[in-house]
Structure formats: C-alpha cells, structure tokens
Design a protein with these regions (language model features):
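A surface/extracellular/periplasmic glyco- and lipid-processing/surface-interacting theme
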Residues: 2-146
Length: 146
C-alpha cells in the first residue's frame, strides 16, 4: 500500500509537499518524490523523483534537486521511534520551515535551493539549540532526545 503525505488532497495550493518515500526491497535503493498524488484513474504521478543508493554516501550533483528542495535524501534524516525511545538520535535531523524564512541560496551539504528570502536560512544550514537551552526534566525520553 502506498500512502502519500497529505492523504487524498490533490490541490498543490493546500496540500503541502506530498512526499512519498519508498525503499525498494532487495535493491538497497531509496526512492523519494515530491508532489505525489493518485489520479481519479488510479495512476500515481509525481512532480519530481530521486533515487538513492543506500549502500553509498554519494551526493547528487551540485544544483540538482530531489524529492526535497535541498537536494538531500529525506529518509536518513528522519527521527526513528527506536532512536527517540533509546534517548539518543546519532544523526542530523531534517527540519522544514515556511518558504518566507528560507533564503534563495544553499550551503553544503545541500545541493539545491528554492527559498524566496534574501536574508533567510539557507538550505542545508546546520542548526542547533543554544547551549543555555534548559531541557525540562518533565519531558519524555523521546522529547529530550529530539
């Protein structure tokens, strides 16, 4: 069964990015898409797709987009429930922002940009909490890890 982010919504103005992430069994290949929807006739359509070899650290060529506007794979940057429950997430996390705060530029490791602000956050920016940020003791193990 294939489910698209955004459910059955097919209106690009209101549905969000509608990503679909698929790991092809037996091939070690990840497929990711952007603005994916199912037509009335049952056909799946995507505005763009990208394939990733999960056995390689190779990046897309500079200026190439992917299912993600930054040109990066999404799946490896997502929080996994098992990591959060263990209290540690040993990799970078993918976060998203409204277009209005994203710069129309990118920095490594990103390969592409799609923002519309000249002074915003560049695609690929590495962000972190200030060292002075106090993690509330009442937060769950998962919330603290994230």
């Amino acid at each position: 069964m294939l489910k698209a982010e955004g459910g059955t919504c097919n209106d690009p103005a209101t549905c969000g990015d509608r990503h679909v992430l698929v790991v092809e069994q037996g091939t070690c290949r990840l497929w990711e898409s952007y603005f994916t929807y199912r037509s009335a006739g049952g056909q799946w359509t995507s505005y763009s797709t990208a394939a990733w070899d999960l056995g390689s650290n190779a990046m897309r060529p500079d200026t190439w987009t992917s299912g993600d506007a930054a040109g990066l794979p999404m799946a490896p940057l997502l929080v996994r429930a098992s990591e959060a429950s263990a209290g540690e997430i040993p990799h970078a996390l993918r976060v998203t922002f409204r277009d209005a705060v994203l710069a129309n530029t990118y920095v490594w490791p990103a390969r592409h940009r799609a923002g519309n602000s000249s002074g915003g956050i560049p695609f690929g920016a590495l962000l972190r909490l200030k060292g002075s940020f106090a993690i509330p003791p009442a937060w769950t193990t998962q919330a603290k890890a994230i």
